[in-house]
Curated annotation (Swiss-Prot):
Residues 17-99 form the Lipoyl-binding domain. It holds the Pfam family GCV_H. This is Glycine cleavage system H protein. Binds 1 lipoyl cofactor covalently. The glycine cleavage system is composed of four proteins: P, T, L and H. It comes from Methylobacterium sp. (strain 4-46).
Length: 120
């Protein structure tokens, strides 16, 4: 199940763990990424709180926690090679995984059709 936020983050749910990243639109708007800072495993995130930072040649941007939960994994590959986020933002360029405090809260986020209709 793929869901999106208005802040241009995506989540893919597998069981009660969501993989989180930024959308292709966000990656294109940022330009070439040169730095990624991810949350540490075990960090408890609250919806709307800054969870990660992506920095490009244009700007630095916070990536917000889309829902409440605990970080279970960080994608160290994008820390070592930030350009992976630009090349495959909704695949190999994922940022972190989190165990959702309430998996049903995912229903409040947008599906692909609703995200596609969002003014950009």
């Amino acid at each position: 199940m793929l869901r999106f936020t208005e802040d241009h983050e995506w989540l893919r749910l597998e069981g009660d763990v969501a993989t989180v990243g930024i959308t292709r639109h966000a990656a294109e708007q940022l330009g070439d990424l040169v730095f990624v800072d991810l949350p540490k495993v075990g960090t408890t995130l609250s919806k709307g709180a800054a969870a990660a930072v992506v920095e490009s040649v244009k700007a630095a941007s916070d990536v917000y926690a889309p829902l409440d939960g605990e970080v279970t994994e960080a994608n160290d590959a994008v820390v070592a090679a930030p350009e992976t986020v630009n090349q495959d933002p909704e695949g190999a360029g994922w940022l972190y995984r989190m165990r959702l405090a309430d998996p049903s809260s995912l229903d409040a986020l947008m599906d692909e059709a609703a995200y596609a209709a969002l003014p950009k």
